[in-house]
Amino acid sequence: MRTHIQEIIVVEGKNDTNTLQRYFDCDTIETGGDQVNQKTIDRIAKAQKTRGVIIFTDPDTPGEHIRRIINQNVPDCKNAFIPKDKAKTPKKVGVEHARKEDLWHALEHCVTFSNYQQSLSWEEFIDLGLVGDARYRYTICEKLFIGPCNGKTCFKRLNQMNVHKEDILKLLKEESYE
């Protein structure tokens, strides 16, 4: 029996839909590429109001672009992230290439980004070494299930999740990076 997913999952294309529906009882909205049009945004907004939405785009630049557009236009969507190494073939990257276990892990650890009051200052972010050291940043992103990202995006996502300096220090200590 396939696991039922209440929310509607936003994906990039038909192959993503086919893969998810092979493993899960779920409905999807396909964006059809990285130029998300207003009609698609309106469908996603309606779905968010009625059933909730999980944005599950590919772990690449176009996927991040789509995710950013949707999050800016439709508040309080859940976001599922899958690591690039769990969603690729030798030539391609995408949700459709992931194993069932990895897809489920990503869906279980969705995060919601909200309009935020700053919980972490830029100075604290720099002091933590998250601007210059991709390794630290990757560790934090992985632990919080927010997908790998550059410094600016990481700073924004941490604040949107109301993460404080103490929370990051605790995560780094668990990984013995201090």
Model-predicted regions and their roles:
Residues M1-E12, T17-D25:
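Glycine-rich, flexible N-terminal cofactor/catalytic loop recognition
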Residues R2, R22-D27, D34, Q38-E178:
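TOPRIM fold recognition
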